[in-house]
Amino acid sequence: MLSKQIPLGIYEKALPAGECWLERLRLAKTLGFDFVEMSVDETDARLARLDWSREQRLALVSAVAETGVRVPSMCLSAHRRFPLGSEDDAVRAQGLEIMRKAIQFAQDVGIRVIQLAGYDVYYQQANDETRCRFRDGLKESVDMASRAQVTLAMEIMDYPLMNSISKALGYAHYLNNPWFQLYPDIGNLSAWDNDVQMELQAGIGHIVAVHVKDTKPGVFKNVPFGEGVVDFERCFETLKQSGYCGPYLIEMWSETAENPAAEVAKARDWVKARMAKAGMVEAA
């Protein structure tokens, strides 16, 4: 029987950079995490993972089996560079091909959830056409994911198109597909003018995972825990009382820090203390 403890994971970019997943998962285990979320961002180096050989994919599966630390989710932010809403047909086609490869990769290595970035476009000007193309691209993507039995989950973003659970639910209702769900970031959700607790309650039944980070209005990255506006204890209480039992992922970008492991351990202790106050975990 699976343990009733809260699954707590760490973002790949919080840990030292490199391509050795056995080392990364061993470190995550030492730090007390249950899982690591993989990043496939817009850089060529991380995009290249989608073209890994069979042997490279098997090495990841083997590392998971050896350490017991899972890689159940992928943060797919590559669509900043190749957006599904692009008015350039070649760029949009590339975005759909990245989606196809990501779904195939997930199927091969056991990733269950691909977190999507809710940008119709990122470096270009958005308009009605980019949003229409984005919707159509999502529909095509969810069709692919359905066939592969891989869940696509929309992140709540640092971008007005997808800055609330209510807006993301609109896409969930439009797509009406069990393989499309929500992956809120309580930091991003709190940085906008949202009723955060009401939004979290509205998403219950569609939330498959939760990103945990601190933010300030207009500042969505690298805000030290406790220095931003997120009311972590209330968010954790709301999710617990609403019946959410899924994973939480600490999102950090400390891979280039002098001592990433120390930064992560400090953040882990801070977050777990707030979880304990919310009655989610036992106090240390």
Swiss-Prot record:
Keyword check for Isomerase: yes
Keyword Isomerase: yes
Gene3D superfamilies assigned to the protein according to its UniProt record, in alphabetical order: Divalent-metal-dependent TIM barrel enzymes (3.20.20.150)
Pathway: Cofactor degradation; L-ascorbate degradation; D-xylulose 5-phosphate from L-ascorbate: step 3/4
EC assignment: 5.1.3.22
InterPro entries: L-Ru-5P_3-Epase, L-Ru-5P_3-Epase_Enterobacteria, Sugar_Epim/Isomerase, Xyl_isomerase-like_sf, Xyl_isomerase-like_TIM-brl
GO molecular function annotation: intramolecular oxidoreductase activity, interconverting aldoses and ketoses; L-ribulose-5-phosphate 3-epimerase activity
Catalytic activity, as annotated: L-ribulose 5-phosphate = L-xylulose 5-phosphate
UniProt keywords, alphabetically: Isomerase
GO terms classed as biological process: L-ascorbic acid catabolic process
Highest taxon in the source lineage: Bacteria
Stated role: Catalyzes the isomerization of L-xylulose-5-phosphate to L-ribulose-5-phosphate. Is involved in the anaerobic L-ascorbate utilization.
Protein name in UniProt: L-ribulose-5-phosphate 3-epimerase UlaE
